[in-house]
Regions:
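A ligand-binding cleft/hinge motif common to bilobed small-molecule-binding domains
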Residues: 5, 19-31, 76-83, 101, ...
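Short helix-initiation/N-cap motifs at beta->coil->alpha
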Residues: 1-8, 52, 91-105, 143
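Hydrophobic residues within well-ordered alpha-helices
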Residues: 10-11, 45, 60, 107-108, ...
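Bilobed "Venus flytrap"/periplasmic-binding protein-like clamshell domains
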Residues: 22-23, 41-99, 119-123
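Extended ligand-binding regions for polar small-molecule ligands
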Residues: 50-72, 146-186
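Acidic, polar ligand-binding/catalytic clefts
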Residues: 1-59, 133-134, 138-140, 192
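Periplasmic-binding protein-like
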Residues: 38-47, 126-165, 183-194
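Ligand-binding clefts/hinges and TM-proximal coupling segments of bilobed small-molecule sensing domains
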Residues: 72-94, 130, 134-135, 165-194
């Protein structure tokens, strides 16, 4: 099911939960409740591996950025803008794309200077294509990935959060994080986010 269709179906009550690593945003929290977080969603910039001119947040000033339309990437831009302002810089041209693979294609081909993504997505593409992409610095504060339930479905929210708590206590959550994300996230909130 397409991403936007999944969100609409959950909001309409067609589904009880979206068990996928959804990034929590203020807008999403207005419509959905989130199970206890399963991973970090701090955003980092990703650059071309051969472009050594982009080493710090300050170096991003005035550069062309690609983001996915309607995404958490777009929602994190005010944080990036504030970080740039602290260095005396400004947010450059922002190009919105329908999907993340298109952003990476244009970044690889030099049509963009950088893109931003959560640590999981950023590390994944850098690991898969280290000669093409390189990981930059954080461009946002803390953020989280979690499963969504319809707003007010407290029974399901607590049930799924209890499952995550058991996984955390047993060490299985850290094992799965290491296996799939390349690192464990020990500093996540331990309660649902509503």
């Amino acid at each position: 099911i397409p991403w936007t269709g999944m969100l609409a179906a959950l909001a309409a009550g067609k589904y009880d939960a979206a068990v996928t690593g959804t990034i929590m945003t203020e807008d999403r929290l207005k419509a959905y409740d989130f199970v206890t977080p399963i991973a970090s969603a701090t955003h980092y910039f990703v650059r071309r591996a051969g472009d050594n001119s982009l080493q710090s947040v300050a170096d991003l000033s005035g550069k062309t950025l690609g983001v996915q339309a309607g995404s958490a990437q777009l929602a994190r831009l005010p944080e990036l803008k504030a970080l740039l302002a602290q260095t005396g810089g400004t947010l450059g041209k922002v190009v919105e794309y329908p999907s993340t693979p298109e952003i990476y294609a244009d970044l690889a081909n030099g049509r963009l200077d950088y893109m931003i993504n959560s640590i999981i997505g950023a590390q994944s593409v850098v690991k898969e294509r280290p000669k093409v992409f390189a990981l930059g610095q954080p461009v946002s504060g803390a953020g989280y990935h979690g499963w969504m339930v319809a707003k007010g479905n407290t029974d399901l929210l607590n049930y799924l959060s209890g499952f995550i708590a058991q996984m955390r206590t047993s060490g299985r959550l850290a094992e799965l994080q290491n296996k799939w994300f390349g690192q464990a996230f020990d500093d996540l909130p331990t309660t649902p986010v509503t």
